[in-house]
Amino acid sequence: MRLRLIAVGSRMPRWVEEGWHEYARRLPPELALELLEIPLHTRSKNADVARLIRQEGEAMLGKVQPGERIVTLEVAGKSWSTEQLAAELERWRLDARTVNLMVGGPEGLAPEVCARSEQRWSLSPLTLPHPLVRILIGEQLYRAWTLLSGHPYHK
């Protein structure tokens, strides 16, 4: 099974890249975790933000192949405990489809992306900085995998 994080934004600080790669490399090859970055369009004072969000959404959906699962990360999504995330991860594994985790830009996800989502996941009711979200997703997926594998990381 492939897990892909499709996120709006690029040129993250080095600590973000290191944190992401640390958790991605810890996962086994049969649970490959990949990051696809969608460039964030420049938001000027007079920018048509709705149009920019639509363009970013189109670019995100352009990375998804027919039949692949889309899971959007949204504040209004469902909060999962570690055990619940582990159960979802196991369901995704058994489903054998690529799972695309979608993280929008500063204004969120395009409505077209949300409409295609099979599941909505909320990391927290708090507004989190996008660089930190990447690391949190990687760590939580790793933690869920260790729980399923009986690894002592999750205690």
Curated annotation (Swiss-Prot):
Its EC number is 2.1.1.177. It comes from the Bacteria. The keyword Hydrolase does not apply. InterPro entries: Alpha/beta_knot_MTases (IPR029028), RlmH-like (IPR003742), tRNA_m1G_MTases_N (IPR029026). SUPFAM superfamilies: alpha/beta knot. S-adenosyl-L-methionine binds at L73, G104, L123, S124, P125, L126, T127, L128. Homodimer. Its main location: cytoplasm. Belongs to the RNA methyltransferase RlmH family. It is found in: Cytoplasm. This is Ribosomal RNA large subunit methyltransferase H. HAMAP family: 23SrRNA_methyltr_H (MF_00658). It catalyses: pseudouridine(1915) in 23S rRNA + S-adenosyl-L-methionine = N(3)-methylpseudouridine(1915) in 23S rRNA + S-adenosyl-L-homocysteine + H(+). GO terms for cellular component: cytoplasm. GO terms for molecular function: rRNA (pseudouridine-N3-)-methyltransferase activity. Specifically methylates the pseudouridine at position 1915 (m3Psi1915) in 23S rRNA. The keyword Translocase does not apply. CDD domains: RlmH-like. Pfam families: SPOUT_MTase. Keywords: Cytoplasm, Methyltransferase, rRNA processing, S-adenosyl-L-methionine, Transferase.
